């Protein structure tokens, strides 16, 4: 039924819907609507992207700060309960373990009941999406609440589980970016654009890192390295603008809440600026990078192997399929019991928060030299002025506690990564790297108690500088990124160790990238997500490989002059999502692509004509409205492996057809690329 129309009073005859005439205050409503349209035109004259990117940064900063503010009080409440519950070891043990076990169980159960996409880091799935793969419902805004609640419960466990929030927060930021992208499309009234959507997603990923660490530069660069192998320069300003807005608002909220006097870095250090390190120490920084590279290879291999074991073991896989909260509770019980302070946790500084772990590890004083002639006490509660005392035990010494911390956290973090709940794994890796650097720095301070002589000047060794380099090197090696060096500088506000830290990161990455896939790529492989495998180490013999060596030989084509019975036979005998369309059976000249779903729909509509006995061919179906897609890019059998790989990465393609003199030959996809052996 058509809508009734009328004429406005005093109009020249332009019709208007009666619903608008009969609505309350029609003139006022028209005036407000016109004013809003005028305001939108004026504001969007400079570009609508600025407003949505700024909104994205501010929203994520508010969420990040509110989460930190609330969870900080929850963690303090847990510590108060543990402190005030009495001297009974049983009660203290229960107060230490039951709290995180309950939170982890709720986090796993709640998030998994709402959506199965909320568990884990989220970065591997985002990397898959940005490579051109569509993961249904992964970025829906309805998943936002499940991720926030689950992540909040995970972080409320404190250092008991030793998990962070970088990965899940990047996922949250990308979900908000996708939602704002849809709002932007409706606001300006344009059609949905895939490239515009990806621009917002990339900016959202950068904002996620920036609002966790208040580090806009490293946030953008880290996402460039981790999320994609090729990055459009056009997206640079979007990422930096949104990340800067988010980082600025995040630190500004701390000033407004009287937590800081002004905008400063998250972790304060006091490295001397005049001579932070001697020239001979460069060798030890490079050695530290090599150690972190080897350690990262061991960690990546063990983590990927154990994660695959949990998916193939019958008992664990059944438990994960039927009762994820139970598995989470069992794993949390093990982790919480080990960190119980009067027990083994005494030798792991388990009473410190993750922030306090980094604050103490970045201390520029040598603990080994300070405890050489005196033993500091182990207070009933951590002393805010001497938090480093938590790392000392008269029987273990500083070296024993640091080594024990590394050994235990190594496998405990691997176990924690298998718990199906929202959690980040970057900050724990960063702290483990800082402990590796601290251990080497303490050893050097004992070996050279007066410092290293260089140019006739003796300067003491600062273990905190080695901790900073170790944190950047190990986390960079695990994630295959160089920007962790810049992240270390932004976190501490110090750049005096720029050269040695960067050299350590480069040495660690050189070893890790030649031996193991990154943490996120390994997770993609274990989860069997669609991915384009990287060419590891780019060996020289890989340049001799051409498409003809690994292309798919069998291919089903549809000719324009093919009878419908032959088309139906091809559809029923294969399950391809799309078929190459050729000019004729004899010529095999590739002219387009037809989608399976659209072709099946067209054939179903053609069923009455076929039943009447009319002889029809595929050309009749195509002329009747079945859409075809043009072939804009093809490969040659002589195209090299590296050229094909770069095309897949640059254009976010999943498959390409191979033609010879215009004739459709074969088909190449990610699957064939995986079988090349490089």
From Swiss-Prot:
The chain crosses the membrane at residues 51-82, 91-111, 141-160, 161-180, 236-255, 282-310, 325-342, 400-420, 421-440, 500-520. Expressed predominantly in the kidney. Keywords: Calcium, CBS domain, Cell membrane, Chloride, Chloride channel, Glycoprotein, Ion channel, Ion transport, Membrane, Metal-binding, Repeat, Transmembrane, Transmembrane helix, Transport. It is a multi-pass membrane protein. PROSITE patterns: CBS. It catalyses: chloride(in) = chloride(out); iodide(out) = iodide(in); nitrate(in) = nitrate(out); bromide(in) = bromide(out). Residues 1-50, 521-678 are cytoplasmic. N-glycosylated. Ca(2+) binds at residues 259, 261, 278, 281. One of its GO terms (cellular component) is chloride channel complex. It comes from the Eukaryota. Residues 116-127, 203-224, 349-360, 464-496 dip into the membrane without crossing it. Chloride binds at residues 121, 426. GO terms for molecular function: metal ion binding; voltage-gated chloride channel activity. Glycans are attached at residue 364. Residues 551-612, 620-678 form the CBS domain. GO terms for biological process: transepithelial chloride transport. Homodimer. Interacts with BSND. Anion-selective channel permeable to small monovalent anions with ion selectivity for chloride > bromide > nitrate > iodide. Forms a homodimeric channel where each subunit has its own ion conduction pathway. May conduct double-barreled currents controlled by two types of gates, two fast gates that control each subunit independently and a slow common gate that opens and shuts off both subunits simultaneously. Assembles with the regulatory subunit BSND/Barttin for sorting at the basolateral plasma membrane domain and functional switch to the ion conducting state. Belongs to the chloride channel (TC 2.A.49) family. CLCNKB subfamily. This is Chloride channel protein ClC-Kb. It comes from Oryctolagus cuniculus.
């Amino acid at each position: 039924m058509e809508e009734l129309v009328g004429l406005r009073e005093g109009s020249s005859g332009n019709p208007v819907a009666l619903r608008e005439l009969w609505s309350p205050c029609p003139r006022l409503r028209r005036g407000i609507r016109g004013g809003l349209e005028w305001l939108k035109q004026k504001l969007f004259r400079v570009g609508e992207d600025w407003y949505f990117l700024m909104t994205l940064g501010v929203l994520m900063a508010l969420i990040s700060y509110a989460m930190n503010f609330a969870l900080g009080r929850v963690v303090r409440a847990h510590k108060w309960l543990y402190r005030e519950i009495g001297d009974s070891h049983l009660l203290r043990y229960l107060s230490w373990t039951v709290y995180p076990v309950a939170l982890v169980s709720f986090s796993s159960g709640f998030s998994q009941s709402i959506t199965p996409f909320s568990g884990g880091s989220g970065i591997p799935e985002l990397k898959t999406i940005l490579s051109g793969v569509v993961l249904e419902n992964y970025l829906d805004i309805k998943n936002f609440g499940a991720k926030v609640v689950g992540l909040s419960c995970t972080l409320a466990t404190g250092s008991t589980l030793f998990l962070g929030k970088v990965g899940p927060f990047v996922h949250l930021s990308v979900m908000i970016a996708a939602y704002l992208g849809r709002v932007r499309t409706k606001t300006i009234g344009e059609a949905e654009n895939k490239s515009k959507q990806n621009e917002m997603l990339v900016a959202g990923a950068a904002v996620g890192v920036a609002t966790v660490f208040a580090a806009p530069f490293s946030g953008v660069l880290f996402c460039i390295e981790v999320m994609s192998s090729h990055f459009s320069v056009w997206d640079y300003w979007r990422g930096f603008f949104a990340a800067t807005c988010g980082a600025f608002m995040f630190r500004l909220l701390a000033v407004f809440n009287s937590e800081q006097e002004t905008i400063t870095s998250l972790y304060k250090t006091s490295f001397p600026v005049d001579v932070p390190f001697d020239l001979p120490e460069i060798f030890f920084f490079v050695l530290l990078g090599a150690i972190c590279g080897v350690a990262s290879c061991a960690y990546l291999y063990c983590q990927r192997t154990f994660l695959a074991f949990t998916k193939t073991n019958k008992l664990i896989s059944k438990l994960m399929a039927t009762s994820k909260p139970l598995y989470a509770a069992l794993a949390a019980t093990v982790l919480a019991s080990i960190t119980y302070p009067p027990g083994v946790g005494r030798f792991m500084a388990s009473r410190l928060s993750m922030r306090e772990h980094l604050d103490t590890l970045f201390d520029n004083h040598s603990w080994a030299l300070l405890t050489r002639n005196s033993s500091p006490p182990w207070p009933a509660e951590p002393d805010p002025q001497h938090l480093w005392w938590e790392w000392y035990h008269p029987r273990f010494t500083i070296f024993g506690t640091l080594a024990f911390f590394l050994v235990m956290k190594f496998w405990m973090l691997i176990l924690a990564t298998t718990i199906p709940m929202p959690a980040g794994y970057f900050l724990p890796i960063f702290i483990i790297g800082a402990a590796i650097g601290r251990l080497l720095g303490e050893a050097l301070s004992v070996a050279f108690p007066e410092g290293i002589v260089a140019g006739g000047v003796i300067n003491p060794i600062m273990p905190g500088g080695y901790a900073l380099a170790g944190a950047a090197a190990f986390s960079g090696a695990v994630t295959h990124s160089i920007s962790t060096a810049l992240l270390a500088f932004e976190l501490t506000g110090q750049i005096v160790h720029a050269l040695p830290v960067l050299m350590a990161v480069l040495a660690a990455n050189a070893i890790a990238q030649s031996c193991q896939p990154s943490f996120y790529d390994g997770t993609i492989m274990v989860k069997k997500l669609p991915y384009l495998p990287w060419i590891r180490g780019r060996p020289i013999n890989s340049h001799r490989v051409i498409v003809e060596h690994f292309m798919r030989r069998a291919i089903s084509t549809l000719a324009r002059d093919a009878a419908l019975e032959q088309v139906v036979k091809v559809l029923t005998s294969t399950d391809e999502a799309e078929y190459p369309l050729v000019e004729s059976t004899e010529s095999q000249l590739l002219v387009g692509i037809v989608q399976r779903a659209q072709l099946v729909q067209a054939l179903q509509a053609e069923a009455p004509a076929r039943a009447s006995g009319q002889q029809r061919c595929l050309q009749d179906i195509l002329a009747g409205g079945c859409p075809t897609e043009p072939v804009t890019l093809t490969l040659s059998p002589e195209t090299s492996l590296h050229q094909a790989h770069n095309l897949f990465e640059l254009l976010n393609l999943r498959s390409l057809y191979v033609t010879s003199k215009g004739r459709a030959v074969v088909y190449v996809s990610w699957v064939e690329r995986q079988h090349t052996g490089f």
